[in-house]
Amino acid sequence: MDKKTRVLSAFNCQEVDRIPAGFWFHFPEDSCLGQEGIQHHLDFYHAIDADFIKIMCDGYFDYPNPYIPNIKKASDWRNLKPLGKDHPFIRGQVERCKAINDALQGECCTFYNVYNPMSSMRFGSSDEMLMAHLKEDPEAVMYALDVIAEDNAALAELVITEGGCDGIYYCVQNAE
């Protein structure tokens, strides 16, 4: 049974020859972007012979909305606007996925790591500010989360339709 069939069969509750396995970690910050980051993913995959790859979003943690550094009070979140599908933050991640998938030529399933909007917001600000603003004006923060979710949804769609990924790994950590 090939790797892709194994993973997709397991997802569909069908019989597999063995349990699919994959491992991942964050690559070094100083070498996670561009061709070097792409090569890290490919080298790691080939070294461990995993059944699938979780393509990491290393280098793309901070949601780069230019308005976020100007946020001082909770109501300021209402001024956030989506980055849009053509923003370099989104395009760079799609290009990473496409390069990795082109190199693998369908050998295995690939899933791109997408953080939830709360994590994206936290990466661009701070836990303390975010929690204070949630208490002060939850509707303003919810509005901003919806804006970030719009960008995250565009990213998820594009890494599949243009980047060639089989799906996303949706990370729901933070703000517990």
PLM features: residue spans?
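Membrane helical hairpin/interfacial module
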Residues: 42-45, 49-62
